[in-house]
């Protein structure tokens, strides 16, 4: 069963969908930079329910059905969105799944402050870890003032002013929960070498799987493998 929620934050709302299961285990999904909660996130949530997890997908403000403008959605804002969603459901235990930039949100949200509402584990697909991934975009913004991805998505200097506050070393210094990373060898957006470096730097246990021939977007075969391995790994690290 699914139920839509509108979660308030700063006078705006975050469009959220809860896929319910008869369990105290929860899995929250964070979408990528210019993505939203539809498509693969819906079917990932359905698989999570089959595996006995309450699953939650949501749109960061400025994306999908949530309020706000994308150009105003900084990393700080996305972290606040994730925390608001988790706090709304008050899970006693949960894991985070982040794809691409959604993984960076998950890492920094989890690594900032350890509390009763911190995740037990993090799953990251093709994760943005080191800020250098956005260096080319920053250069465009410095030269032109704005970078437009399409009619609905653009960033300006505000994004990078905020982004600079979140080096990946702040995660490696504070995060100690188990992490699983799944990354394609031919990723054209985020080089897989970043994930090898991140895995070596993280303090907790790390599973890192290289998907040979896969790019930033996974094929259907790789997506199926990702889901299978995700829940096998969760079963091995979560009591």
Question: What is the predicted role of each segment?
Answer:
Residues 115-155:
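Hydrolase active-site cap/lid region
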Residues 24-32:
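Short beta-strand element of the alpha/beta-hydrolase
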Residues 48-67:
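Conserved alpha/beta-hydrolase
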